[in-house]
């Protein structure tokens, strides 16, 4: 079963587009997907289907400035002044909506890329409300970072690539 709905963003401007996917069997838990930069949550439909087949309720939304949220608000790429904090609070609002509808189930977050950073902030503030968190495509140590930066600067200075920005 699919529930599609909107809720008011923390920024009090946007309406956030959200979905709850419910399996046909008795659910064993809830997984909230937090997508990355420039993405939308429907990019994860194959994963959502697999998780539902395993008995999980899955929920997701499109962040401010992203996907269907951007379409319905006509605000592409506009996160506002507190965009990152807004996205984290919107994820918490979604969690509250889902927990009210489906109480007493284990609640997990899956954050990909930028979504993993949102999930980290979420854990810092609301971690006691979670059972587990998966961080995917997140940052880590880059041992040759300085060398890579210098190589990229050189390529930009030479005007290599389709786009270069000397600033």
Predicted region positions:
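Glycine-rich nucleophile elbow surrounding the catalytic serine of serine-hydrolase chemistry
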Residues: 111-121
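N-terminal cap/lid segment of alpha/beta-hydrolase-fold proteins
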Residues: 1-25
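Active-site glycine-rich loops that stabilize anionic/oxyanionic intermediates
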Residues: 36-39
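Alpha/beta-hydrolase active-site loop
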Residues: 79-99
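Alpha/beta-hydrolase fold nucleophile elbow
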Residues: 102-113
């Amino acid at each position: 079963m699919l529930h599609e709905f909107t809720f008011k963003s923390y920024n009090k401007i946007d309406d956030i587009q959200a979905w709850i996917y419910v399996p046909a069997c008795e659910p064993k838990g809830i997984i909230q997907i937090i997508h990355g930069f420039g993405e939308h949550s429907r990019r994860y439909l194959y994963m959502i289907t697999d998780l539902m087949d395993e008995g999980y309720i899955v929920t997701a939304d499109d962040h401010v400035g992203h996907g269907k949220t951007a379409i319905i608000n006509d605000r592409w790429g506009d996160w506002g002044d507190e965009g990152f904090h807004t996205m984290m609070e919107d994820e918490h609002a979604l969690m509250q909506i889902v927990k009210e509808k489906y109480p007493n189930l284990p609640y997990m977050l899956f954050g990909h890329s930028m979504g993993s950073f949102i999930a980290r902030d979420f854990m810092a503030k609301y971690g006691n409300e979670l059972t587990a968190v998966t961080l995917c495509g997140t940052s880590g140590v880059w041992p040759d970072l300085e060398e890579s930066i210098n190589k990229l600067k050189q390529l930009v200075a030479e005007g290599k690539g389709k786009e270069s920005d000397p600033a």
